[in-house]
Amino acid sequence: MQDMSGDRQDRVLKSVTGLEGGAVASGSTCGVLSGGALGIALMHRESLRQYGVHAASAVMEEAGRYVDWFGEAFGATTCRARTGVDFYTVSGQLRYLFPGDRMMRCLRHIARAVRYLHNLSGKDLSRGETSTGQPLHCAASVLRLVRERTGIGDDMLEELAFVFDGGLAFRGGLCGALAGALMALNLAFGNEVRSLRYHRTIKGFVAGHINLLVKSKIGMPEPFGIGREIVREFREQAGYIECRDIASRAFTGWDDFQTYLAGSVYCAGLTASAAEIACSALKEYRS
């Protein structure tokens, strides 16, 4: 997506490396959707800066259509439903890799998703659902809190992270607050995708997937080893990791979500908790 738009934002790319497999292989919203929605926002960065909340609302509508298309084309939007495996078990990881049909299916879906997103380039998204007031966000709020407390952050990522609101474009998937915590973690420990050599990529893949299985993490701090703990702590506090379960409702669009979030003391608390979980992990593993 970044290469198609000609706007390379390596730190933004680094931030989403832990969203693979539905948030640290937890089976939630497919990483192809998370990355694609973020890419849609990046494609329209100038419109976002020029038109503000109206463009952001339009981006959310476009990202929502992308999520809907993906679900219709491939039958599901979550990793657990698409792969049918549990990456936190040896048998699940082996089934995904061998004989290779499920992994190859994911690769084919990635290729189709890229073609879909490519066809969106150049589309005018300057006008969306009418909205007034200062908007509230999930992932962006967590990213801001973590940056203020730890100094770890990225301005561009904070601008674009609104796409995770309401479980990614209001579709009820991965909670935006948890997504924000994981992206903050990845700014510190994520993979530098463009500069990774092949052997480093394989080494990181193996270490990350082993760390999903063992109690004592191996090697240097890496996204999956630390990220699984963030997901676990968040799930213990919220009971779930997906917006539809946490909020117990669906959202019709920008204004509906803003009204809900403005009145939800519970979600405000989860946002603060997600930021605290991320800050604690960063403090522990960067020392």
Regions found by a protein language model. Give the residues of each.
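A structural-propensity feature for long, helix-poor, extended segments
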Residues: 47-92, 193-250
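Acidic, carboxylate-rich catalytic segments that either coordinate divalent cations
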Residues: 92-124, 240-287
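Conserved phosphate/anionic-ligand binding catalytic regions in large, soluble enzymes, centered on
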Residues: 26-38, 168-183
